[in-house]
């Protein structure tokens, strides 16, 4: 596939053969940052221009580069580090006209930087920092030849893609083997094998260029040697088993005369050359390195940018190959970097000892954002700092729980420990000093971190935030919840009472307020639908009335830097009254068993629900007001009352102005009594906060018992709005999502997809039990998904409490025992724990706690999960065992196992655990199956508003059928996202998929294939090898592969092009689908239909029939509505049966086809007529076949019995389009396809092939 560099400027770049020609005039391997374009905007005073610059490296030939003048010079530095010819040189500066260029300035601001200028690369003297960076780059380059290490660190920025190991490029000369075409056994329909071994990425043969590179024990250089220019000493062991002692001096690297026990850093007499890089030195002293290094570079170049660029945020995989001692190579540089707890990976880049995260985050957050160019620079800077912060915090969390960081309060209980590391404040998710005692204790403290993060996200979405929030990230690791926050300047030097100038620090008893904060919070409250309200504060026995724009829990603090911060935003959204035991709820909620007991009292409605509820109430208000005024007009006309008719007409003319004012949240200025009366009636109907104007806002404190409200507050109306919003969730949002599941219009694949869909509708995860009750008695595909997620999340809650009480050295054995209790059969406590306990007691002479886990059995763990399900989700499980529950609801055990392991943050060995086999296993898991733990990370995800707006515009254009406009909007959004995020970002795959779909619809299929390929690789690396998104990307990729091959069909052999490149990804998609969910899913039906159609095309009828029947059976089993594609699948089944000689089965299938078409289109539609004609042909052929078989003679040829002409290839692509929901608008190449078919099927079929091509050009498919 082509390089990921095409992501930068896909709209403006000239496209040749599906590749960008914008980046280089040569076919160079650039960094992916060299052509970042930000779209023009009318408000920009300075238009971004594309400039051409010549780079003259210190080694190699000069090359030309095109880049936008708003880029940083640093991007050119990165380009040189990525190029094959210059990647080994790291210590240099860029000079323009003899003057050094600042790396952190924009290109347009550099004096003399014009189109066509030349930049010279000048090598600089080495320092210790430069030498360490150089060795890090050398290590990264040489790693491309090694097996990718998945075992350390547990949470890094390297992720792999399986798609890169699949050969998608068709070869004209290479013939397809039968083994390349037919599916492996584990992807056949009905196969019970769910081995994880196929999930991991196949590794290439190792290319070892050097055995080890290490810092010499003679470091640091003594004083006399420093004065002679020595910087660092390095020991290198080559593949020839020779050890070279190197000196890094200011001028470069050379071989010195030192030996193992002798220090002599002077230059060797045998090799007196000083090299600019270690790579160049090794190429001259090691023949093995000289031979292998070019192969490593070739392997590196073969990887596209999207395959090898690091991810912005830490990523982890839940499966890995077994850790074999032979594969864990010695790496001295790795040892130095990872065992030093104070190192976080950035200090080599930054001046000073530690980074001031808060200052960096706030400075970039406050950067100007008036113009599009300013927003691009601001968003890019803020995103980069935030990503660095999350990466640093992730390392800090692991070091804390490893015990490598000292608490700032070491004398207190471990649960109350707090830490400061690398200028980041860490706290554990426990109730410290009974702060949350009345709200639920530890459960409330745990939940408070999530709701606080939701508040931070909400404030980050404000159009012009005037308040500063803290950098924040949450980590769930080994059963602990750790919160990382940036530190407000001066906060540690003062008492909390002295710091807080707004809000309450004693849970509402005493409240303080500040007029300065009022001015800053007014806009925020307006956008977040928070109702300003007055509360009574008591101080020194005196009551005073204060105004709050937020909850009393929110605290305003002025830092020593003068910035005004707002924190503790856990009550930014209205409370969920359904989970407040004593709260008033609607009658509908009472009928459903609400309110009910919950572990804590901090449950809040989601921001998405608040926005959708307010929009629905606005629509109701407008409709009600208009209806009442028009009813009055009708009444006046019936009474023939001229005065009333005149007043009503005036009221109707004012109506549009009233609606505009309401939608813009302005005061309604009208003196018309009819309008006023209509507004009052509408306000009463929708339960507006005020009786004479439309106001739907929420007082987050209206159900808080700790705060005393002022007498002027109408608490009844305020509470009514909150109750209505909660009822809206039950009566509107949940029924809608359940119906979407039944109609298969929404198709989540795994628990993460399900959570994203629920959140988009404003439905909290705690309502899973309510959804489960509504789908448990249906045949919807969502039933096993929802119910298994309830079990998985309940298991997570139970296991988390166990892990917190488990010593670190027992985590492996406890985890394997817990998994055995859940997925195997364990009837007695762990014998391993008992043995270890006795051994430890004898050795230490004292009793040692072996943990709660040791007493677990299958029955006790399942009982705890059932109790947690009932308590937390309100879903009662009445089966005695997990196996019976899975069988009852058709849940695949491996899918549940995957969900549980991922949600726990456990990395396991990729092998076949045979969980779905009928044989009962006592212990499926051993200690060796547990490789590691990794943190589950939640954080505020910075986003670019401009890209979001362009995506919304593109989606709107798509809904109107304006494909070209939609394509341009999505392309522009991708350009902006690339400018801000770089190439790798979790939101990018979805945009690329949309762009690929639009490109295909517009006939730009090669580009569509390119976009979809990148989307698939990104999804694998950023979201997961087996995520639901990845499966969708694979399934989408297949179609563009087929269409690209279809276009070239007139030039190459059909089989050689089509089969290997399309079937392998399809088999991969089916394997992933089977592993993640199981077979009864609409997407599995789509995958099987694709496979069956392709296999039918190449006359593999027996195998094709299995997949086509599977697709048909799945659609019927899940109750998917009958539509065109089900009719087409049924028709293909009939044709496959006929091709196999089974005419009776063919007639049954085709009758069903005719029934579907008749139901969809009526009796006179062409498809119904064609089906009837085919039925007659089948009947005639069946009679002929039967006669020949009953009365055979010597002239009977079995091949002559099958006279049914298969459909032309173009018609099969028609079927694939419909299966995949693609609308075709004039695909280039169809005329060639029709011509090829004419030659293949003879002149008798010429007109039919032409008709098919014309139909494909013009028909709109469902």
From Swiss-Prot:
InterPro entries: CLU-central (IPR033646), CLU_dom (IPR025697), CLU_N (IPR028275), CLU_prot (IPR027523), GSKIP_dom (IPR007967), GSKIP_dom_sf (IPR023231), TPR-like_helical_dom_sf (IPR011990). SUPFAM superfamilies: Hypothetical protein c14orf129, hspc210 (SSF103107), TPR-like (SSF48452). One of its GO terms (molecular function) is mRNA binding. Residues 335-580 form the Clu domain. It holds the Pfam family TPR_12. The keyword Cytoplasm applies. The keyword Transcription does not apply. GO terms for cellular component: cytoplasm. mRNA-binding protein involved in proper cytoplasmic distribution of mitochondria. This is Clustered mitochondria protein homolog.
């Amino acid at each position: 596939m082509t390089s990921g560099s095409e992501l930068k400027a896909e709209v403006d770049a000239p496209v040749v053969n599906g590749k960008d020609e914008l980046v280089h005039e040569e076919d160079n391997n650039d960094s992916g940052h060299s052509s970042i374009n930000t779209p023009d905007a009318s408000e920009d005073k300075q238009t971004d221009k594309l400039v051409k610059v010549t780079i003259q490296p210190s080694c190699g030939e000069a090359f030309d580069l095109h880049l936008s003048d708003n880029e940083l010079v640093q991007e050119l530095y990165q380009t040189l580090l990525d190029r094959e010819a210059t990647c080994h040189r790291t210590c240099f500066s860029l000079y323009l006209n003899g003057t050094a260029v600042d790396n952190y300035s924009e290109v347009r601001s550099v004096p003399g930087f014009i189109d066509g200028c030349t930049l010279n690369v000048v090598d600089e003297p080495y320092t210790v920092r430069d030498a360490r960076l150089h060795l890090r780059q050398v290590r990264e380059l040489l790693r491309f030849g090694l097996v990718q290490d998945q075992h350390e660190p547990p949470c890094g920025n390297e992720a792999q893609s399986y798609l890169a190991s699949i050969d998608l490029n068709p070869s004209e000369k290479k013939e397809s083997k039968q083994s390349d075409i037919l599916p492996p056994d584990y992807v056949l329909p009905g196969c019970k094998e769910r081995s994880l071994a196929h999930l991991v990425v196949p590794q290439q043969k190792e290319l070892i260029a050097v055995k080890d590179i290490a810092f010499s024990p003679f470091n640091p250089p003594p004083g006399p040697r420093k004065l002679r220019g020595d910087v660092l000493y390095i020991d290198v062991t080559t593949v020839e088993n020779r050890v070279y002692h190197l000196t890094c001096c200011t001028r470069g690297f050379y071989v010195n005369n030192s030996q193992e026990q002798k220090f002599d850093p002077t230059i060797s007499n045998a090799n007196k050359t000083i090299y600019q890089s270690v790579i160049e030195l090794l190429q001259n002293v090691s023949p093995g390195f000289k031979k292998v290094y070019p192969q490593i570079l070739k392997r590196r170049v073969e990887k596209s940018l999207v395959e090898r660029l690091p991810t912005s945020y830490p990523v982890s995989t839940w499966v890995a190959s077994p850790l074999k001692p032979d594969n864990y190579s010695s790496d001295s540089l790795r040892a130095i970097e990872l065992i030093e707890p104070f190192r976080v990976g950035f200090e080599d880049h930054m001046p000073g000892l530690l980074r001031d995260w808060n200052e960096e985050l706030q400075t970039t957050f406050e950067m100007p954002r008036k113009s599009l160019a300013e927003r691009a620079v601001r968003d890019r800077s803020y995103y980069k700092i935030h990503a660095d912060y999350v990466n640093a915090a992730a390392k800090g969390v692991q070091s804390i729980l490893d015990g490598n960081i000292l608490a700032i309060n070491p004398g207190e209980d471990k649960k109350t420990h707090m830490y400061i590391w690398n200028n980041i404040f860490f706290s554990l998710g426990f109730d410290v000093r009974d702060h949350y005692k009345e709200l639920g204790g530890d459960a409330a403290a745990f939940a408070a971190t999530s709701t606080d993060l939701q508040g931070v996200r909400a404030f980050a979405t404000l159009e012009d935030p005037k308040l500063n929030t803290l950098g924040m990230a949450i980590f769930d690791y080994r059963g602990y919840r750790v919160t990382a926050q940036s530190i407000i300047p001066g906060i540690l030097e003062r008492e909390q009472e002295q710091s807080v100038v707004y809000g309450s620090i004693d849970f509402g008893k005493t409240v303080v307020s500040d007029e300065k904060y009022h001015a800053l919070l007014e806009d925020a409250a307006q956008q977040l639908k928070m109702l300003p309200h007055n509360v009574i504060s008591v101080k020194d026995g005196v009551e005073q009335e204060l105004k709050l724009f937020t909850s009393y829990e929110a605290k305003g603090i002025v830092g020593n830097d003068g910035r005004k911060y707002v924190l503790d935003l856990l009550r930014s959204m209205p409370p969920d009254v359904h989970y407040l035991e004593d709260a008033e709820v609607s009658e509908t909620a009472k009928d459903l068993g609400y309110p009910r007991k919950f572990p804590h009292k901090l449950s809040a409605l989601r921001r998405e629900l608040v926005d959708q509820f307010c929009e629905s109430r606005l629509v109701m208000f407008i409709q009600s007001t208009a209806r009442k005024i028009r009813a009055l007009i009708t009444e006046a006309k019936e009474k023939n009352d001229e005065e009333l008719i005149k007043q009503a007409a005036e009221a109707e003319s004012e109506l549009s102005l009233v609606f505009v004012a309401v939608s813009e949240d302005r005061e309604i200025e009208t003196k018309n009594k009819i309008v006023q009366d209509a507004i009052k009636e509408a306000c009463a109907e929708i339960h507006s906060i005020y009786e004479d104007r439309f106001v739907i806002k929420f007082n987050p404190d209206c159900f808080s018992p700790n705060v005393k409200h002022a007498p002027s507050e109408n608490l009844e109306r305020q509470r009514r709005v909150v109750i209505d919003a909660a009822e809206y969730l039950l009566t509107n949002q949940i029924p809608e999502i359940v119906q979407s599941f039944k109609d298969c219009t929404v198709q989540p694949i795994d628990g993460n997809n399900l959570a994203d869909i629920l959140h988009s509708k404003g439905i909290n995860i705690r309502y899973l039990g309510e959804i489960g009750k509504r789908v448990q008695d249906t045949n919807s595909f969502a039933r096993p998904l929802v119910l298994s997620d309830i079990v998985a999340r309940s298991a997570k809650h139970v296991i988390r409490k166990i892990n917190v009480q488990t010593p670190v050295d027992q985590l492996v054995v406890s985890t394997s025992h817990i998994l055995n209790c859940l997925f195997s059969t364990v009837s007695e406590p762990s014998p391993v724990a008992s043995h270890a306990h006795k051994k430890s007691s004898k050795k230490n002479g004292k009793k040692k706690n072996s943990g709660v886990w040791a007493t677990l059995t299958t029955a006790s763990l399942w009982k705890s999960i059932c109790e947690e399900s009932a308590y937390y989700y309100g879903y009662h499980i009445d089966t005695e065992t997990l196996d019976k529950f899975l069988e009852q609801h058709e849940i695949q055990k491996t899918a549940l196992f995957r969900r549980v392991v991922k949600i726990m943050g456990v990395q396991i060995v990729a092998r076949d655990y045979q969980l779905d086999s009928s044989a009962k296993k006592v212990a499926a898991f051993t200690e060796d199956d547990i490789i590691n733990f990794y943190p589950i990370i939640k954080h505020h995800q910075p986003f670019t508003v401009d890209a979001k707006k362009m995506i919304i515009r593109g989606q709107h254009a798509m809904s109107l059928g304006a494909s070209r406009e939609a394509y341009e909007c999505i392309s522009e959004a991708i350009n902006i996202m690339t400018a801000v995020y770089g190439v790798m970002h979790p939101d990018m795959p979805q945009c690329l998929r949309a762009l690929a779909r639009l490109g295909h619809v517009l006939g730009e299929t090669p580009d569509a294939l390119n976009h979809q390929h990148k989307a698939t690789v990104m999804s694998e690396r950023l979201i997961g090898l087996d995520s639901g998104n990845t499966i969708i990307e694979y399934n989408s990729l297949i179609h563009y592969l087929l269409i690209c091959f279809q276009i070239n069909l007139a030039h190459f052999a059909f089989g050689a092009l089509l089969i290997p490149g399309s079937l392998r990804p399809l088999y991969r998609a089916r394997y992933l689908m089977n592993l993640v969910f199981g077979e009864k899913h609409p997407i599995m039906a789509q995958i099987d239909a694709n496979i069956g159609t392709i296999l039918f095309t190449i006359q593999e009828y027996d195998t094709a029939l299995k997949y086509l029947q599977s697709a048909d059976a799945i659609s019927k089993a899940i109750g998917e509505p009958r539509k065109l594609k089900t009719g087409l699948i049924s028709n293909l089944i009939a044709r496959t049966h006929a091709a196999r000689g089974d005419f009776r089965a063919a007639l049954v299938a085709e009758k069903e086809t005719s029934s579907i078409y008749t139901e969809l289109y009526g009796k006179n539609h062409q498809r119904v007529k064609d089906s009837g004609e085919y039925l007659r042909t089948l009947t005639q052929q069946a009679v002929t076949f039967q006669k020949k078989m009953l009365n055979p003679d010597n002239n009977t040829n079995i091949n002559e019995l099958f006279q049914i002409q298969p459909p032309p290839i173009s018609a099969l692509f028609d079927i694939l389009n419909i299966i995949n929901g693609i609308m075709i608008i004039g695909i280039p190449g169809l005329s060639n396809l029709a011509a090829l078919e004419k030659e293949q099927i003879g002149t008798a079929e010429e007109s039919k092939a032409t008709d098919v091509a014309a139909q494909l050009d013009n028909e709109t498919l469902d």
